[in-house]
């Protein structure tokens, strides 16, 4: 079992990565003893893992569950209220703990519910998708979507522990696994050139779910994110680099309707647009764009935006992006493999050229 620490002073917490961790009561015991436990999961994950985690936690306290519909389109205030209603109807107090058992949608909603309920109760992340294991479960970003924008209603709220059981990936649909790889590849582009090269060399091992390769890839992503979050918890500086591909990607998700494009698929296409923007600005050359595209394609990810999206569609959503400051769209762009920066002087004419030529 691999352990990584997210250093945030009194809000520090561990990430555990390994196999069969959902049956490891010893690791969870210190976070659950004498607490009432409410597990939040969805209709897809519940038949696979809910009974197992309930049995693991039953010796520590009273365990109940809430099962939500599965999909990004249900990450909204209405379904957040379902969690609040369960907590209130069953008289959960401040000594309770919420457990997020699922992917990024469940993790984001459960964390936001924990941040809000009685002004804050403990929560635990048990991510079951690759995307949530390498990205959304770490760092304390919690939110729900609004019809006008993704993750617009939320809070920074850190979990007590992140428990990553890599065996969950064996029940993950291939499309979901590929979507997670978009976030994995992002770390190589924006932070670690050696990791990017390792990914290029280990495509087959990862696609065949080689245990050693999975643990290494997930661990390296979590190490990078833990490092970044420890430096900049609330995204005032370096943490913004983790949004590589996301400004374009969030526009795709919002325009196409949440759930039609998976988050990772939109990030993949958005990462290519970011790379093409960087090339248009003279920050990188064509060879780097090609390496990025080839690696994304190796994992069966989309490398272009939907044909139905034009420049006006993109710019409307990008102007609402959370990184906008003083009315200026700010983009995270690669400056090399392994490096990225935030740029606020990208003109709309440059963006139009990139989007129209993509």
Swiss-Prot record:
Entry's localization field: Cytoplasm
Keyword presence, Lyase: yes
The keyword Chloroplast is assigned to this record: no
Name of protein: 3-dehydroquinate synthase
Entries under SUPFAM superfamilies matching the protein: Dehydroquinate synthase-like (SSF56796)
Role noted for this protein: Catalyzes the conversion of 3-deoxy-D-arabino-heptulosonate 7-phosphate (DAHP) to dehydroquinate (DHQ).
Alphabetized HAMAP family for the sequence: DHQ_synthase (MF_00110)
Cofactor field: Co(2+); Zn(2+); NAD(+)
Chemical reaction(s) catalysed: 7-phospho-2-dehydro-3-deoxy-D-arabino-heptonate = 3-dehydroquinate + phosphate
Organism the protein comes from: Shewanella baltica (strain OS195)
Gene Ontology MF annotations: 3-dehydroquinate synthase activity; metal ion binding; nucleotide binding
E.C. numbers: 4.2.3.4
Pathway note: Metabolic intermediate biosynthesis; chorismate biosynthesis; chorismate from D-erythrose 4-phosphate and phosphoenolpyruvate: step 2/7
Cofactor binding remark: Binds 1 divalent metal cation per subunit. Can use either Co(2+) or Zn(2+).
Pfam families for this protein: DHQ_synthase (PF01761), DHQS_C (PF24621)
Protein residues bound to NAD(+): 70-75, 104-108, 128-129, 141, 150, 168-171
One GO CC annotation: cytoplasm
Lineage: Bacteria, Pseudomonadati, Pseudomonadota, Gammaproteobacteria, Alteromonadales
Signal peptide span: none
Annotated positions binding Zn(2+): 183, 246, 263
GO BP annotations, alphabetical order: amino acid biosynthetic process; aromatic amino acid family biosynthetic process; chorismate biosynthetic process
Membership in a protein family: Belongs to the sugar phosphate cyclases superfamily. Dehydroquinate synthase family.
């Amino acid at each position: 079992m691999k352990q990584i620490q997210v250093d945030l002073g009194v809000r520090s917490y561990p990430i555990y990565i390994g196999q069969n961790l959902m049956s490891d009561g010893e690791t969870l015991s210190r976070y659950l003893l004498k607490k009432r436990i409410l597990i939040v999961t969805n209709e897809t994950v519940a038949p696979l893992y809910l009974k197992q985690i309930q049995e693991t936690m039953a010796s520590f306290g009273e365990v109940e569950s809430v099962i939500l519909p599965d999909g990004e389109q249900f990450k909204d205030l209405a379904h957040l209220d379902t969690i609040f209603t369960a907590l209130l109807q069953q008289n959960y107090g401040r000594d309770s703990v919420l457990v997020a058992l699922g992917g990024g949608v469940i993790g984001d909603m459960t964390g936001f519910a924990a941040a809000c309920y009685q002004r804050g109760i403990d929560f635990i992340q048990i991510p079951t998708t690759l995307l949530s294991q390498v990205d959304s479960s770490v760092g304390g970003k919690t939110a729900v979507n609004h019809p006008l924008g993704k993750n617009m209603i939320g809070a920074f709220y850190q979990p007590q522990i992140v428990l990553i059981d890599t065996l969950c990936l064996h029940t993950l649909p291939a499309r979901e696994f590929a979507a997670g790889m978009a976030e994995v590849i992002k770390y190589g582009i924006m932070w670690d050139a050696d990791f990017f090269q390792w990914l290029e060399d280990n495509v087959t091992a990862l696609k065949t779910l080689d245990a050693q390769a999975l643990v290494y890839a997930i661990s390296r992503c979590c190490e990078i994110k833990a490092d970044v979050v420890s430096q900049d918890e609330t995204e005032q500086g370096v943490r913004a680099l983790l949004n590589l591909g996301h400004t374009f990607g969030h526009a795709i998700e919002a325009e196409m309707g949440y759930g039609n494009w998976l988050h990772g698929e939109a990030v993949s296409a958005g990462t290519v647009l970011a790379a093409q923007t960087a090339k248009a600005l003279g920050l990188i050359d064509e060879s780097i764009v090609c390496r990025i595209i080839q690696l994304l394609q190796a994992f069966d990810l989309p490398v272009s935006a939907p044909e139905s999206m034009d420049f006006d569609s993109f710019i409307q959503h990008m102007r609402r992006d959370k990184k906008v400051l003083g009315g200026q769209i700010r983009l995270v762009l690669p400056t090399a493999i392994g490096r990225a920066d935030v740029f606020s002087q990208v003109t709309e004419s440059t963006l139009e050229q990139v989007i129209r030529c993509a």
